[in-house]
């Protein structure tokens, strides 16, 4: 069936901000869908609230709306654009839920819009737990024994049937949100209450426990003519009980016999037919009991998912692109496989001659109070994938690509300590983020594979593979370097051992080991990912390293530029940096360079095989990058676009003779090294907050006395404000030095005077060495002290005078030229009174670059990449700062709901996972839309509770006056109420939590409050008010912890609920006029 001609325009729903469970894989799928549909001649309309995505680039769709993915906003877009069809399968759970809302509210029917890719009934059948259960029984497949509950009474009735432990999963949520495993009644009630609260349909599925069962996934694609292919089978290394997004996974499945594989293959096809997925990709999850072989279907997703991004990258088969084309009527046999250059049709099942391992990346260090045990609710924030010829090789490559300080199966436990045995037992029994390293330690301690299997449920096959690696390590430890000959070195490298790990085992430096290996002439070769196990030729350069005979890299002799990506997502380094890498690749390819991407994150657009000319799917370690450089001999390497990951390699790459283009590693060091930075600030006669670098506790106490409290304290060289705190007095400083960091000569601690009540600013600029152009000045809404990645910001600034902005421009230009920046640079400044302080300078791509580029209609990352390759800003015609004639607000999105027990207060340590953008004619409108995009519901009336610290009291009466004018009743604690009453306003007093009942938390629990403005300072007051913030989060009450955000909310509420939607392309056209 060729493509449909009865539809002309298609609306694609994006996935919105990055949250745990829904990350950049949906930017990857959405961007592919946009490209696929436009090349077929359709008009594409896109809605996505996340500005850091490639899919929201104005060139990706015909009409782009950076608007909230809520049915109300999308309805306005449908009314304006009149699309013929909507494609909801590319934007994760967010898009599916939005599509179902549009259907339910009659919007699709009213405007005659058809749902393609999956219809409402299919989505409902797959997502509604009771319908899915019945559908599986109809085709003779088993689901886990389970029951459905819509209330606590029903839940208790199901529990009677199933007993403990049981697994609770809310309907229509993703990443297992709100679910969990209950081992006793108390846990059961807590999880069920939370689950009923979070499920949009107030429905829970309560399952028998399958903990310890083996878990598999099948990635399936089906078309209208019932052609089905399995793209890839995926096996979970961790058994059931750990969410698949948090499991180590391996593709293809390693421990199935062919017969078992065929049974599962047939079952997954039957599931797609029964649910009615006719066009596109789905994944089906299975559990198998290791003792009896009983197989159950756990769930299916009728959409492109996290696993399909992994399967696409693992096989080279572009699932999202194919799914988009099937949705418009094509069949698999009509579509060509790009990787083989059209030599095979898309109906060929991919076959692969290598092993892929995915490891999750966690961020528990950011949330010390979070429960770090892994259960059925997803907690990881990113992932890394590695390709090798054997499981051992791909596992060890993935371990070093994860960037958690391990270069392989490094030891975690001191086996000589008396606690060792009990630590190992606990870590093996209850899975945590680092279980695989504990498994290795258990093997070192003499535990047998059987004993480990009994504690972990990890398949014996995997354990035997790991045991072999540990035995090999023990052998290497006994040898001298000279004893390792060419054959033995090859054997070790084929098992995936890194130079660094071998050097540690031999007690020598990495450099010496690498020299020895090169002397033996042991080098990796590069193999191609070609979807067909080398049966057909491929022109696509999608490569991975391994130690074999034949190298398939065939590098060209063109001028090449290599871009180092950011590795796995984590808090503080996410999709924004990937966006910059993609833009660099696109710009330099346009300019005639051959572009080479090195990265290991399977979720991203940068690791798509057609983003750059050549893709090396390799860990970002010195060894791996140097080997790629050895083969490719690039003319220049860009290290400034992938966040801290490639920057950490800059110096060592330079020493090894790799040509780094753009800002020099020495200039980067001048900006990062405190003492060198201070000299520069003084030389330019600029201001910075009084500060000191200390190397012992005594020194710290002395320095603190002369700088004056409050202080910002942190270890040097960190990204995302790791272990950063504000301390208000001596005892707090001592506690920080004791508990949070080990201060020493090698790891100094930085003290800065904290600028209380200051307005923070962020500036992005491009410099070519002689000219500097400001990309944008952004004003933070939260005052200084909140990490810049967590603060909302406004572009242009909404309350800074022209004089202040001009002075900022002068200072930024001075610093760019003094540092010799070539490329991008980001500066953070603070305004206190009438003084401007420089807080920090980063001569690299920052996380605000995508947001700024969307606001000013010009890609800073592209311009800067061209500058790094030798162009001047004058040649590029970018000489003038572009100041938008509309307001844009960027708002951060947080994962607090996933981590009960964590305080949702903002501070100097970054905690957000993603961002959204709101656009409006006024600051208030833009802020209101950003809140809506972040799924924060702004109250329109009711009772506002206000309690602020002394420093905020001068502003509090103004906020109260606004709220009363907007129809709110104001309640406040004694100190705050006094100030409001003094201004002649009506206020009701309420007890603080520490002053006896009824207090404010009682009001929250009784749903008597609709808005909370609660600001604190100092450890004690933060601890006292913790229950206010946590309860507000549980009761979904809008709560802000800064007075500045309180003022912004008043602006947003004045704007009122009537929304207009704006095309990005129209906004940009207005800037050029």
UniProtKB/Swiss-Prot annotation:
Xref: SUPFAM superfamilies: Carbamoyl phosphate synthetase, large subunit connection domain (SSF48108), Glutathione synthetase ATP-binding domain-like (SSF56059), Methylglyoxal synthase-like (SSF52335), PreATP-grasp domain (SSF52440)
Positions annotated to bind Mn(2+) 3: 828, 840
Pathway, per record: Amino-acid biosynthesis; L-arginine biosynthesis; carbamoyl phosphate from bicarbonate: step 1/1; Pyrimidine metabolism; UMP biosynthesis via de novo pathway; (S)-dihydroorotate from bicarbonate: step 1/3
Protein residues bound to ATP 1: 129, 169, 175-176, 208, 210, 215, 241-243, 285, 299
Positions of the UniProt region annotated as Oligomerization domain: 404-553
Positions contributing to ATP 2 binding: 714, 753, 755, 760, 785-788, 828, 840
Gene3D superfamilies tied to this protein: 3.40.50.20, ATP-grasp fold, B domain, Carbamoyl-phosphate synthetase, large subunit oligomerisation domain, Methylglyoxal synthase-like domain
GO biological process, one term: 'de novo' UMP biosynthetic process
Reactions catalysed: hydrogencarbonate + L-glutamine + 2 ATP + H2O = carbamoyl phosphate + L-glutamate + 2 ADP + phosphate + 2 H(+)
The protein's required cofactors: Mg(2+); Mn(2+)
Binding sites annotated in the UniProt record for Mn(2+) 4: 840, 842
Domain called MGS-like: residue spans: 936-1073
CC cofactor note: Binds 4 Mg(2+) or Mn(2+) ions per subunit.
Similarity section: Belongs to the CarB family.
HAMAP family the UniProt entry points to: CPSase_L_chain_A, CPSase_L_chain_B
Subunit structure: Composed of two chains; the small (or glutamine) chain promotes the hydrolysis of glutamine to ammonia, which is used by the large (or ammonia) chain to synthesize carbamoyl phosphate. Tetramer of heterodimers (alpha,beta)4.
NCBIfam families, A to Z: CPSaseII_lrg (TIGR01369), PRK05294.1 (NF003671), PRK12815.1 (NF009455)
PANTHER family: CARBAMOYL-PHOSPHATE SYNTHASE [AMMONIA], MITOCHONDRIAL, CARBAMOYLTRANSFERASE FAMILY MEMBER
Protein's name according to its UniProt entry: Carbamoyl phosphate synthase large chain
Primary gene name: carB
